Amino acid sequence: KYAAKISVDTSSIQYENDEVMKPEWGDDYSICCCVSATKTGQEIQLFGARANLAKTLLYAFNGGFDEKHRIQCGPKMERITSEYADYDEVIEKFDWWMDWLADIYVNVLNLIHYMHDKYYYEAAEMALINNDCERSFATGIAGFSHVVDSLSAIKYAKVKIIRDEEGITKDFEIEGDFPRYGNDDPRADELATWLLRTFFDKIRRRHTYRDSKPSTSILTITSNVVYGEATGATPDGRYAHTPVADGVSPSAGKDVNGPTAAATSVSRLDHFIVSNGTLFNQKFHPSALAGREGLEKFVALIRTFFDQKGMHMQFNVVSRETLLDAQAHPENYKHLVVRVAGYSALFT
């Protein structure tokens, strides 16, 4: 309850679930980077960039043609040419492109880690690690919720494909309703589980640098802005070149059934697969957590999420009006703290 009160007052705390961490990392683990666990003094984490699966889904529609840069980025494959997206066809092509991406992704990370060891070996840091250390090969996923929602839209609604004069998919029109990730709907959450397991299965089938143990994460930190800028419109209704959702959080504004429903959807993911970490952001207006009753409900939310085997959650407790006023008058908010990702920062 004391920690929750600090969250309400300062937005400066993140919560990690021991019961999820211990089976993989043991009792003596540390948090490295932002939210990832590591065996203290016994492990090296080889980390690299994230795989933008939202962009990969668009490659499935356009046969590897990049809708933004107007170049062929992958093998020239058959495009989806139907007026409406067919779920089975999309899944088949998307699965192929995820396999292609996993191969390139792991090979590039292998090269990065080899060159890092060759030209920037961290001798001082290595002196603090056991000789017989473990090595984890950390990968990551970006655009997660948008892919889940896109597949759900194609499966449960009708998605019309909008193409430019060259036949390249540039936008989508959705007809009908569909379940979205983050609303405690098993239909969407099953697609989320499928996506995570399918892509990670492709990662761990590849040879990794120094036979390190593959792991994955869904923790974009702030890179979701950059990945979104590089990605066209997606079938879930997200506009072209706008940020993708941060970390494992639902798409912005689409978790309409409340924080408990969003937390339940996130907790349904197999966090022993995504062992390198998930980053789950939630935002509250201060009035929602005011007083003793508000604080007790807040504590109950955190405990319930962890009881459901969720891994990580953090909160921004600040009003929109405060943030807008801080933008306009930063001199009045020199001590305003916001939770960015796995770290806090002064807003101004």
Language-model segment annotations:
Residues 1-348:
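Conserved catalytic cores of very large enzyme subunits
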